[in-house]
Amino acid sequence: MANGLPHLRVVTTETTRTHCPYCAFQCGMTVTAQQTTHRELRVQADPDFPVNRGQMCIKGFTSAALLDHPARVLAPKLRGASGKLSLVSWETALDYVAERVLALQARYGKPSVGAFGSGALTNEKAYLLGKFVRVALRSPNIDYNGRYCMASAAAGQNRAFGIDRGLPFPVSDIAETKALMLWGSNCAETMPPIMQWVYEQKNRGGALIVVDPRRTDTARAAALHLQLTPGTDLLLANGLLFLAIEHGLIDRDYIARRTQGFDDVRRSVLTCDPAHVERITGVPIEQQMQAVRLLADAESSMVLSGRGPEQQSKGTDTVSALINLMLALGKVGKPASGYGCLTGQGNGQGGREHGQKADQLPGYRYIEDAAHRAHIAEIWRVNPADLPNKGKSAYELLDSMGAEGGLRGLLVFGSNVAVASPHSGNITRKLAALDLLVVCDAFENETSATAHAVLPTAQWAEEDGTLTNLEGRVILRRQVQAPPPGVKTDLQILAELAKRLGRGEGFQFDSPEQVFEELRRATQGGKADYSGISYEKLEQNQGVFWPCPSNSHPGTPRLFAERFFLASGRAQFTAVPHRNAAELPDTDYPLFFTTGRYKEHYNSGAQTRHVPALMDAKPEPRVQVHPRLAARLGVVDGDLLLVESRRGAVRFSVLISSDIRADTLFAPFHWGGRQAANLLTMPALDPISRMPEFKVCAVRARPASPIEGTH
């Protein structure tokens, strides 16, 4: 009491509209900061954002738990002679990194040092990282984890349409389509808020078809589930086109007016008769026919693919086969119709548009195109001849670490490559062989286990930045609070390193918005043209769809209504004969193995494994085993099962489930160490996209004792 009055606790609140740090749906959220004796953050779904409309998954609701987590790295660390990481000043850490980079490049050449980026980086960070590698490092070697995610869909769409945007229409079109096929996407778990559009489509009388080796939560919602053998997606897609042709379901007028190359495709699918397709894929002829009739007969229909058909050594061709089908049915470019890809990472779309990929420059330009190089060189104020050529793709880049002529130093931004890569045991060994490994992240993870330097970075709510969601909608993620003392943003780290490498003049920006202004100019005239987009415009319009080539342009929510982006203006059919996965079951390894996600976790788990509520819900990976296979192996629910491939072995807890095929095992890939599913997976690469074959490999299994480890 003072002067007879009670003490009153002062409470201040401030609410910021921003976006989730996880998947490409990029749910709108509001974060309310309440300050009393301490600061608390309350996260809610934004009811006014038109993509998620007030819905959000458990990952989004718990995302603030990451910001003040006790395991967070809050100061730079260097690994000393003892082999342990120790806290150092920023000056010491940055000087060390720059000195090591210069020494390695002096000894081994400019390409000996590279960077690995992320689909979690904002557009500004992706842009500046690409510029940093090519201008400050003068190295060709940059790629990002989107190569593990979107590369096959991107290559397939570019081949057919001349452009790559995950969805060529707004997500709201899903609710309007009369027939929806979800191919290899368990979006009920991987992107739960999108299901409101799927359920709305069903409630309006639309048909839902799901293609997946597992009876997932998504498949349970479907009128028709095609439970195919892993790795046979390409044959099934070709088989559906065969049926469409045989039964007169194709749109010959559309094919003549808007496409080219159909005759080659027609001839290529003549061997894909339904009986043959059933033998190889396991999908009954009746279901094949039902699926193609639903797509063909509906006034509007669309196919949306996920990682299932894409993360294969023939992923690009499989995407082409899906596009071939929808072109032949005359659906692409029509209302609520066509083909689309459900992008995975938060900025998986924007991350590949602005220079993180080994072969690309900002605006979806190509590094080996002389005119494209000249445009970017002018923006960056460098000689086009000084820009390096195309570098190695993600897995090839990592596989070169420590090898003759390969990487000697690597800077990793926002990616846990030791868990996310196929044949991850190989990558872990290669990381340990580097002369310099720098990990820029908010938490230590499996990749930083052998890092020479760990540089702490700001998190999603601690800086402004733009991202591009699965629709091609550019959005503005607003800062909620300042980063903790001792933490820098990725943009600041790149600027400091560039200065120490003698190229600081092109990296001194006062804000992310200033970086975006340069990005706008860099993308002008490109396929992914952001030149008409500004921070102000994004806030006023709930995001803007690219291309947006001028300040007065409203953006482009829908593509292909009048023409495609190839020089002819037509879509291109591509003949894609079926071929087997790189590794099939045999007598030594008689089972298929495939991977996927849990609703509660995200990608390598580097973030979600730090959130108590998510770990309480899903504390460990479990291997799905069909009851018949479990009986044959002699295991029951909760037993330990040792799963082995030619690359490694993992001991999983068993989950008995009739949702999986009896010839297939499934496990999630969110864990590292001895629980890493990617110890088993196959590094065979798609010849076009360089996507690894995560989704298909051969394994064997037997009961495991509690003391058996992994290798």
Predicted regions and their residues:
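N-terminal leader/propeptide and maturation segments of large enzyme subunits in energy/redox metabolism
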Residues: 81-86, 249-285, 362-377, 381-386, ...
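Conserved short loop/turn motifs at secondary-structure junctions
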Residues: 114-121, 280-283, 306-313, 345, ...
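Long, contiguous, secondary-structure-rich segments that constitute the structural scaffold
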Residues: 484-542, 604, 608-624, 628-711
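Flexible glycine/proline-enriched surface loops and loop-helix/loop-strand junctions
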Residues: 180, 221-222, 271-275, 304-309, ...
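N-terminal export/assembly segments and adjacent metallocofactor-ligating motifs
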Residues: 1-249, 257, 261, 265, ...
